Amino acid sequence: MKRTAARELAIQLSFAAAASGAEPAELLERFFDREHYETLAAEQELCAEYPDDNSLEYIRKLTGLIAENRSEIDGFIERYARGWKLERISHTALAVMRCAICEILYMDDIPAAVAINEAVELDKNYDDPDTVAFVNGVLDGFMRGEFPSEEKE
């Protein structure tokens, strides 16, 4: 499974965890049950291939870090989404931004530019162009505000 697909699954699972209040580990266990996953494969192309061990580890790590650091990550989103409360932001846009900010802050093997570009591209699958532009602006503002001396690698 390519990293982009694993990232999209992580975004979907983070969205589901936030919406349901479920623990990410429990959600992951149910979601990646082979029998359950095979039924998903028939319904959505993203699930056509069962994740390999590296992809599963990446998804587990990312969803766990998002859940563990959600209040800090949400604080950054509120700071750079000037004039917007989290409640007004689409849930998918929130999940996408949480993923990108988490990767930038806590996953050193992922360049910031990759995290932002992937987030924006994935958000295009779920949100309208105005929301995608908003997500891009928040993530760009986050980089400029928190890492002013660094390039987006």
Spans of features found by a protein language model:
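N-terminal interaction/assembly modules
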Residues: 1-153
